[in-house]
């Protein structure tokens, strides 16, 4: 292929965690990712779009859940509409065409990758959970042991300063977990075994890409 991908990339579904043995016989906790197949939905070029990219889709969408623009676009490209669509930037033109598939064998055992996903939502939490505050003295007369205490001042500037650590929503954010190692690739099952835990719930969708960091090691 003539692709000049800055990194390998694919969409995957998190299946859960298990354990595997590495080449040295050590037990390694791994996350099983159902990677692909991702179908190329669109090929963008610098001439028509201003940059080179592949738009890939993952998991078929029910026709009844498509709006008219999505249905017309899928019919025009002659590919099935997908639930999840992701764009992969390229450094140069690609030989891939609409309808081609990206599978888990894009990666190999030993590759170092980043995994992008959404962390589990933990709901609304107070300052002791969110910021590791100490509780107030549990002595006679104190009715607010888990509260944040003072959050500002009186006369000047007379407001709560930006960045004040207070009760907040915890989790549910887009997270990039860096420098995982691909322990094994299982093309017959379409899965990747990735060292350690990755963001999100089981059955959640994650974006797997070659690690951008220059650090020479990967998570065990």
Task: Walk through the language-model features, giving the residues of each.
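Extended basic (Lys/Arg/His-rich) segments that typically form rRNA-contacting surfaces
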Residues: 1-220
């Amino acid at each position: 292929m003539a692709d000049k991908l800055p990194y390998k990339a694919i969409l995957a579904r998190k299946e859960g965690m298990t354990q595997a043995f590495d080449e040295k016989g050590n037990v390694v906790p791994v996350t099983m990712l159902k990677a692909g197949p991702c179908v190329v939905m669109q090929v963008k070029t610098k001439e028509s779009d201003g940059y080179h990219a592949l738009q890939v889709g993952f998991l078929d969408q029910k026709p009844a859940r498509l709006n008219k623009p999505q249905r017309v676009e899928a019919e025009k490209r002659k590919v099935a509409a997908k639930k999840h669509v992701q764009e992969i930037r390229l450094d140069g033109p690609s030989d891939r065409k609409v309808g081609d598939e990206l599978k888990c064998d894009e990666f190999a055992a030993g590759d170092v990758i980043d995994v992008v996903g959404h962390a589990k939502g933990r709901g609304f939490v107070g300052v002791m959970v969110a910021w590791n505050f100490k509780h107030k003295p549990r002595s006679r007369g104190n009715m607010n042991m888990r509260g944040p205490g003072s959050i500002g001042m009186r006369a000047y500037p007379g407001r709560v300063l930006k960045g004040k650590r207070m009760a907040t929503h915890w989790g549910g954010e887009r997270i990039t977990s860096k420098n995982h190692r691909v322990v094994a690739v299982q093309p017959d099952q379409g899965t990747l075994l990735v060292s350690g835990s990755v963001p999100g719930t089981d059955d959640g969708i994650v974006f797997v890409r070659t690690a951008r960091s220059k650090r020479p090691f990967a998570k065990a």
